């Protein structure tokens, strides 16, 4: 059976929020069924587009040139995760609640790109998108799926990190993750992460509250209940390529966590 990967990113989800959330699934899943860390390291600036560009291209923002949420085409071509997988004839699906991620890969790399915008539907966007993603995984068993949820970050900017509204959003994320894990066919590995954390109603600094993220790795090649000290956001794309049996580009800075 060919290995497959589901990457789940919950925007702005702090590790201490995972520990304190009313909905227990994500917390218990990480602790009992994953190799994980509560001390993952984001990149500076700790802002969504720079962070996710760094995740997918395994380089720091100074190399890919995106320093805020306005996309800038890199001056030097760096193949991203979607692009490398497409070149290796892998089927990529992308589910997102934020339109600004539209330039994450080159045209043609995605078999499907589904957008359900938070600014139109609110937290219902996450619920609808999760249902669509779950249906596609069951029906198609794609090689790689990226599910991006922006609800937690949007709520935090409005009401504040670690407040009751934010914690409710983290619980919703936990419920959606449980739904996605529940439909996975045999052979899937899962990577769960955040792009950054946050403090008060903002983020983007080097404060631990902004830079520290949870990361969980689930699947047949990961030890259950093993806690790692530190994982960089830059290591996730190389790890996913390694799981899927694809060569890691030389220009990437991160390393596979399977090494």
Task: Describe every region a protein language model picked out.
Residues 1-259:
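Feature captures the catalytic ectodomains and active-site-proximal regions of enzymes
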């Amino acid at each position: 059976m060919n290995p497959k990967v589901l990457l789940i990113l919950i925007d702005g989800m702090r590790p201490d929020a995972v520990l304190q959330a009313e909905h227990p699934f994500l917390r218990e899943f990480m602790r009992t069924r994953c190799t994980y860390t509560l001390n993952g390291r984001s990149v500076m600036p700790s802002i969504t587009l720079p962070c996710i560009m760094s995740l997918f291209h395994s380089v720091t923002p100074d190399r890919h040139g995106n320093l805020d949420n306005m996309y800038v085409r890199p001056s030097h071509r760096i193949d991203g995760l979607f692009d490398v997988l497409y070149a290796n004839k892998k089927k990529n699906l992308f589910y997102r609640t934020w339109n600004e991620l539209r330039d994450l890969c080159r045209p043609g790399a995605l078999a499907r790109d589904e957008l359900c915008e938070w600014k139109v539907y609110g937290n219902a966007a996450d619920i609808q998108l999760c249902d669509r993603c779950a249906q596609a995984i069951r029906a198609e068993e794609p090689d790689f799926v990226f599910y991006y949820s922006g609800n937690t970050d949007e709520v935090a900017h409005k009401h504040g990190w670690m407040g009751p509204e934010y914690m409710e959003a983290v619980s919703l994320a936990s419920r959606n993750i449980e739904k996605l894990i529940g439909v996975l066919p045999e052979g899937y590995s899962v990577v769960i992460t955040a792009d950054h954390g946050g403090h008060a109603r903002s983020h983007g600094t080097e404060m631990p509250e902004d830079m520290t993220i949870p990361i969980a790795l689930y699947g047949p090649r990961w030890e259950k209940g093993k806690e790692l000290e530190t994982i960089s956001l830059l290591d996730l794309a190389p790890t996913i390529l390694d799981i899927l049996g694809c060569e890691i580009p030389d220009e990437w800075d991160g390393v596979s966590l399977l090494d």
